[in-house]
């Protein structure tokens, strides 16, 4: 089963992924972008080089293609639980070029079975961002991140409608352990 955690920076994805790694010891825990060695190089170029937005989008698509081919598909073949910090959903939400068709090509139509969306309101986001050093995206402000969050929701629900991916939306401001319990129950509930 392929499970992805989605949410804007500061929503608590990394915290939950860490807890899930401890809970599901045999799971493959990965991330996007940068879930492969090549992906780390592509991510570095995409985030640090002065390149066009279109070139940046294609670097992230290349990273996604390599990640699916070398990490996700082999783990699915072995029937492993896969837990990924981000996926094509973030790729489409953060990019100016959010083509589902190109992402389906990059993923070879390998899509998550379950999508966990950690959603946060403006005040909660401001509070969390005030406690950390901000990266390039976070420095664009809470309004930009809230716009991205809406795109995350839109893309996740589009995958649900078109491909049957299950979606769980959670209030990221709830306690870490309440969220963890709900996420574990969602993962363990195999219909």
From Swiss-Prot:
SUPFAM superfamilies: P-loop containing nucleoside triphosphate hydrolases. GO terms for cellular component: cytosol. It holds the Pfam family Thymidylate_kin. Keywords: ATP-binding, Kinase, Nucleotide biosynthesis, Nucleotide-binding, Transferase. GO terms for molecular function: ATP binding; dTMP kinase activity. PROSITE patterns: THYMIDYLATE_KINASE. ATP binds at residues 7-14. It catalyses: dTMP + ATP = dTDP + ADP. Its EC number is 2.7.4.9. It comes from the Bacteria. GO terms for biological process: dTDP biosynthetic process; dTTP biosynthetic process; dUDP biosynthetic process. Belongs to the thymidylate kinase family. Phosphorylation of dTMP to form dTDP in both de novo and salvage pathways of dTTP synthesis. This is Thymidylate kinase. The lineage of its organism: Bacteria, Pseudomonadati, Campylobacterota, Epsilonproteobacteria, Campylobacterales.
